[in-house]
Amino acid sequence: MAIDYDKIMSLKSNDVEYSYSDNDTMLYALGVGFGRDPLNRDELEFVYEKNLKTIPSMATVIAWGAGHMRDSGINYLMVVHGEQRLKIYEPLPIAADILVDSRVTHVIDK
């Protein structure tokens, strides 16, 4: 199935409310491999409640279900994720209520 470029480029979401908790923050860290070595104290602050910190890359997936791409008509089993950009201006809070704005900036159909 061909990609409908105009449809995908017109998709966007504005001010979608989403919440995440400290539990989500720790689960993300565990999911990407932090905490495998119980003796590695550098990773402890990402998987344990005391002095908890958020991994910056969590911003790329934090509100995945709140986006607009469900209506894109794309078969995601056939998609290769080529690249993504992330600008970090300050550390993510360990838990928050956020507003999500998202849009597609480029599409390449190979």
Regions found by a protein language model. Give the residues of each.
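Hydrophobic beta-sheet segments that form the core/acyl-binding groove
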Residues: 79-110
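Hot-dog-fold acyl-thioester-processing enzymes
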Residues: 1-83
